[in-house]
Regions:
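Nucleotide-activated chemistry modules centered on ATP-dependent adenylation/adenylyltransferase
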Residues: 78-101, 105-136, 152, 156-462
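Hydrophobic positions on the alpha1 helix immediately C-terminal to the Walker A/P-loop
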Residues: 148-149
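Acidic, low-complexity/disordered tracts enriched in E/D and polar residues
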Residues: 1-42, 77-80
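Short acidic, hydrophobic short linear motifs in intrinsically disordered regions
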Residues: 36-56
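Short, glycine-rich nucleotide/cofactor-binding loops
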Residues: 136-145
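A short, conserved structural fragment
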Residues: 52-76
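Hydrophobic residues embedded in beta-strands of well-ordered beta-sheets
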Residues: 13-15, 64-65, 104
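Short, exposed beta-strand/loop patches in secreted or surface proteins that constitute
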Residues: 6-10, 56, 96
């Protein structure tokens, strides 16, 4: 008897792989079927005749196998196979493959991905602004990464910083305390916070929950809220605070192609884009401004058709964009700010600080925590060893829902935290032992629903 190999799924006239394949097939996740092949595959599992095996050709032995040759997918970490180098495993990333040396595709790609730093321009120093009270702005959550960024910009570079906080209903107590302590510790920072009305937020969250099985809208909804503020204050730079593991995770999740990491430095492409702007009598864009407009327009008007056709759509952002449509009035100020800034050229440049470089070569989580505790009064979450995503009470719920959707092949999106903790352990952001401890104690990779899901539903069901 034959069947479709584990982690392959028939969708229309293609077989799609849900997992992370070995090099060089890492992103070769679809196989197109002929009509005859599709007819045969649709009736699996069953015995196959010699003629049917001949029609299936090279699929047999790869995507189509004898029933006893199907790979077993573990149902817990205890049964998982782990990478020899990092902590990637075939439970938290079902369908991940390993080479003959026991390395996962993330570790197989170390040399190929070493220069993939950011999909927006990298800047580690900034000039003083001549047109604004603020040199830079950041979105501040009270978490580890945004606190370190705020410390670096205000205390190390001694810049005037605008810190913008979206008060989500799930903000952790430790994050709230960290924000208050930062206000007392960082004298060159001005803090602004905003809260979406419960009526609007529940409309958005209910739609997002229907699409994604969680309500995580960060940071997209914060962009919607605060872009008009950035334009009104003529802030020259909006600085992102994503740590290296998060940025590289986009590549392995097939959300950002290699070219996306080189585009920020492509003067030729920006030149061509500016030629088009010249015909509409608009000022040329400077470094990082294209990325700002592209991001804000995506949120205001929806995803790029070209990007979707190329197969690099971001399911998470797409779902957030769809959910925001449930409260359309929230987009009006954003759309006005986009039009005004595009006409005037007063566009805050979207840039990223290289956390590895500014922290001495490796963004070591424990050392970073020590710095921000000392300099900013940062308060660690209850699970004090936790290093990933430290500001939200329902982070585990997001991890659980992303994991469950991927495990059961309802989504092609690999759980973000699964990739990030694996990349971080490979890149010496934390030791393999510490990463393993965080994986087992602090992350939401469970086939059973976890308590944090009740916290999420409690808000949207009121």
């Amino acid at each position: 008897m034959y069947d479709i190999q584990s982690r392959w799924k028939l969708e229309s006239n293609i077989l799609r792989y849900y997992g992370l394949r070995n090099q060089p097939n890492m992103f070769k996740n679809t196989v197109k079927l002929t009509k005859k092949q599709k007819t045969i595959v649709e009736k699996l599992p069953c015995d196959l005749t010699d003629d049917e095996i001949s029609i299936l050709k090279n699929l047999v032995g790869a995507e189509i196998v004898k029933f006893e040759s199907k790979k077993l997918i573990p149902s817990s970490l205890d049964d998982a196979k782990f990478c020899k180098t990092c902590i990637a495993n075939d439970f938290m990333i079902p369908g991940i493959e390993f080479d003959a040396e026991g390395r996962c595709p993330i570790c197989q790609s170390t040399d190929k991905t070493k220069d993939l730093k950011s999909i927006v321009p990298i800047m580690n120093t900034f000039p003083r602004s001549k047109k604004s009270r603020f040199d830079v702005a950041v979105f501040y959550t009270g978490g580890k990464d945004s606190t370190y960024l705020l410390y670096y910009l205000s205390k190390v570079l001694k810049l005037s910083v605008l810190a913008l906080t979206w008060e989500i209903p799930y903000m952790s107590e430790s994050a709230k305390k960290s924000i208050e302590n930062a206000k007392r510790s960082l004298d060159s920072v001005e803090f602004i916070s905003r809260k979406v009305s419960n009526d609007d937020l529940r409309k958005i969250y209910n739609k997002l929950y229907a699409l994604s099985e969680n309500t995580c809208a960060c940071p997209s909804l914060a962009y919607v809220l605060f872009y008009p503020e950035l334009v009104a204050n003529k802030v020259p730079y909006f600085v992102a605070g994503n740590e290296p593991a998060q940025l590289l995770g986009l590549y392995f999740n097939h959300m950002a192609p290699r070219i996306a990491y080189t585009f920020p430095d492509s003067k030729g492409l920006i030149f061509l884009f500016n030629v088009g702007r010249a015909f509409t009598l608009r000022p040329p864009l400077k470094k990082g401004q294209f990325h700002t407009l592209a991001t804000m327009k995506q949120l205001a008007y929806g995803d790029s058709k070209i990007k979707n056709m190329a197969g690099y759509s971001n399911e998470l952002v797409y779902n957030v964009c769809e959910a925001i449509k449930e409260a359309p009035n929230i987009l009006n100020p954003l759309k006005r700010a986009i039009r005004a800034s595009s006409r005037s050229g007063n566009i805050p440049a979207f840039v990223q600080v290289d956390f590895d470089e500014i922290s001495g070569g490796a963004y070591e989580w424990q050392k970073i925590k020590d710095v921000i505790i000392r300099e900013c009064g940062w308060v660690a979450p209850e699970e004090s060893d936790k290093g990933l995503h430290t500001s939200c009470k329902i982070e585990k719920c997001k991890e659980h829902s992303q994991f469950a959707r991927f495990y059961h092949m309802r989504s092609t999106m690999i759980p973000f935290s699964a990739l990030e903790i694996a990349i971080a352990s490979r890149s010496n952001n934390l030791s393999r032992e510490k990463a393993m401890e965080e994986l087992k104690k602090s992350l939401g990779f469970s086939l059973d629903e976890i308590p944090e899901c009740a916290i999420m539903r409690e808000y949207i069901e009121r």
